A protein has these predicted regions:
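Ser/Thr-rich, Pro/Gly/Ala-heavy low-complexity intrinsically disordered linkers and tails
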Residues: 1-2, 7-70
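Active-site substrate-binding loop specific to GH73 endo-beta-N-acetylglucosaminidase modules
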Residues: 59-75, 87, 95-548, 559-595
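GGW-centered surface loops in extracellular recognition modules
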Residues: 80-83
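Axial heme c-ligation environment in periplasmic c-type cytochrome domains
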Residues: 551-554
């Protein structure tokens, strides 16, 4: 293990970050081995540093939905907070740095698994989690120490990382300085200055060659340029010190992490090195190249999975009622996993060759497992041929697929289903009134004489509840065409708590639903999906969510042009692929505003 004072100094680096001067100096950028704590943590839990609390903390608070889609091309971009690498980005960056060293990621795995999970305290996208807590600091230090120790434990590993010259009996200064420059360029995602190389080189003072290399590896892995998206080296726009065009290396890094969640590859780095990335044609070619890579599609699919909460599932109930309800359905974790994979396949297919409306209206079958195909009443899709269609009139788009409909027990909850559409698909807040009476949020009890719709409607028929529920509950009632496993039905089974099947009753999915564009009469889920596909508010909501996912924060004044560009491409004639690529092509992507 490296010395305790060295580790404490590293922790101080993470807790405070200045913005000027040489590394290691008071008020410096914190990237050197002697950096000290330049600031105190933000209010919050003990040990939280800058970035603790909600994403964008310190920026003016405003209603996020007040930011319009009216683009003024000459307007400044919005102010963006300093962001650390997400845990996914951090792992992929480590993997790229130590690709030549066998077992490096395995050596780091224990410490990596102790890092806080992004999004564990965030209601929206995981990547909007900007916290730096004591757990993060401890984790980063432990990862750096484990990886550095792993490299130094075998001369062959050090040779793979730094060259054979690193294993001489004494320190080869030229070899050492070259390693600092080469490894630092990758870890910091830009070339190091001469001053930085000299300051890292001071780690060789008073120690043997092995400890010098180990110290550099450790120090660079806990430096802010490694752990944060630092953008400090741009050029002033029209003489304005607060508005910067990103430097070529900053732009390369922003683009790569945006599309790949990973650091720039060799080709992208080369365009930054020679400055050609600043050319519009070269930049657009690199955007296209990165977007054509499977890693970009993975990033897009992950967006929809998080937006639609696909990864949130606590397992199926083990009650007698559920056992009766699920007879013959193979209701297990494998069924849910297959349903989640179907969503990924549907999204990937229509991102490549479709538009946003297709995600609401598609009746194509992407069920690859036999159990899920049986639930839909179709043959499994083979994963390569053109997908066939689901039974006519039963399903349309994402909202009607099993992963969006499966509940943990035998019943459905129209309130939850409807609130999701209102809140997440139409971007209209669903706020419970103050002073709710006891039991207000508890589902109504089973009634052998009533359907789920009748029971839930009776619960909120009082004037206190009816007005609010009228805005979102009809969406959930239209989805009563599907049971708690996502099976299409025209009749609802009435099952008591002991698992006795008492009979069945017709399902009513006719609703009068309130959209921002006006009231609509809908006969069921297919018409609901079609109405959402045609809703301008739903299109705007998609643009807002994809902005938040991409920029890791809520939109602010100055983001109107990015939002407008996204919205422009989600209409009936638009391309979902172009919409998702638009963020990188917007002029604001190349600039940073300081306040």
């Amino acid at each position: 293990m490296l010395g305790r004072p060295f580790l404490l100094g590293a922790a101080a680096v993470l807790l405070g970050l200045g913005c000027g001067g040489d590394i290691g100096q008071a008020g410096g950028d914190g990237s050197g081995p002697e950096a000290s704590n330049a600031g105190s943590g933000a209010p919050g839990e003990p040990g939280e540093g800058p970035g603790g609390g909600e994403p964008g903390e310190g920026l003016p608070e405003a209603d996020p939905y007040s930011v319009t889609f009216e683009c003024e091309p000459d307007a400044d971009p919005s102010v963006a907070p300093l962001a650390r690498l997400t845990v996914l980005q951090y792992e992929r960056t480590l993997d790229a740095l130590f690709a030549s060293v066998p077992g490096a990621m395995d050596a780091a795995r224990g410490a990596l698994d102790q890092l806080p999970i992004d999004g564990e305290q965030e209601e929206s996208f995981a990547d909007m989690d900007g916290r730096i807590s004591q757990r993060h600091i401890d984790g980063f230090i432990n990862v750096a120490d484990a990886v550095a120790a792993h490299v130094m434990a075998d001369p062959a590993r050090l040779s793979a990382l730094a060259g054979d010259c690193a294993n001489g009996g004494s320190l080869d200064r030229a070899c050492f300085d070259a390693f600092i420059a080469d490894f630092g360029r990758l870890a910091h995602r830009r070339p190091l200055s001469d001053a930085e190389i000299a300051r890292y080189g001071e780690l060789a003072g008073g120690v043997d060659a092995a400890e010098a290399y180990r110290g550099v590896i450790f120090s660079m892995l806990i430096a802010p340029p490694m752990l944060y998206h630092l953008e400090l080296g741009g050029t002033e726009v029209d003489g304005r010190s607060e508005l910067l065009d990103l430097s070529p290396h900053e732009l390369a890094s922003r683009l790569s992490y945006h599309l790949w969640q990973a650091p720039p590859d060799a080709e992208l780095r080369a365009t930054a090195d020679d400055g050609s990335l600043m050319s519009e044609s070269v930049f657009e070619a690199q955007v296209q190249r990165l977007y054509d890579d499977p890693r970009a599609l993975e990033t897009v699919v992950r967006f929809f999975g998080e937006w639609y909460r696909i990864d949130i599932f606590g397992g199926f109930a083990t009650t007698p009622a559920f056992e009766t309800f699920a007879t013959g359905a193979n209701a297990d974790q494998a069924l849910y996993d297959a349903a989640a994979e179907e969503i990924e396949a549907l999204v990937a297919y229509h991102v490549e060759q479709g538009n946003y409306r297709d995600l609401f209206e598609s009746d194509l079958n992407f069920a690859r497992s036999q159990a899920l195909a049986d639930l839909y009443g179709v043959a499994p899709w083979d994963g390569t041929s053109d997908p066939g269609a689901l039974p006519d009139g039963e399903r349309a788009g994402l909202l009607t697929r099993a992963a969006m409909l499966i509940s943990s027990n035998h019943g459905t909850n129209p309130f939850k289903r409807g609130a999701f559409i209102q809140r997440d698909i139409l971007c209209t807040p669903v706020e419970p009134p103050p002073n709710l009476p006891p039991g207000a949020l508890t589902p109504p009890p089973f009634d052998p004489m009533a359907t789920t719709r009748e029971r839930f409607e009776a619960k909120v028929e009082s004037p206190t509840c009816a007005g609010c529920h009228a805005t979102f509950t009809p969406f959930g009632m239209a989805l009563e065409a599907y049971d708690g496993l996502g099976r299409f039905r025209t009749e609802e089974q009435l099952i008591d708590d002991d698992g006795n099947l008492l009979g069945s009753v017709p399902v009513d999915t006719q609703v009068s639903a309130s959209f921002p564009e006006g009231m609509q009469e809908l006969s069921g889920p297919v018409e609901l999906s079609q109405a959402l596909a045609e809703s301008e508010r739903a299109n705007e909501c998609f643009a807002r969510h994809y902005f938040r996912y991409s920029f890791r924060r809520v939109e602010q004044p100055g983001d109107e042009c990015v939002l407008s560009g996204l919205l422009e491409r989600v209409g009936p004639t638009g391309s979902l692929r172009d919409a998702l690529r638009q963020v990188a092509l917007d002029p604001a992507f190349k600039r940073r505003l300081w306040r």
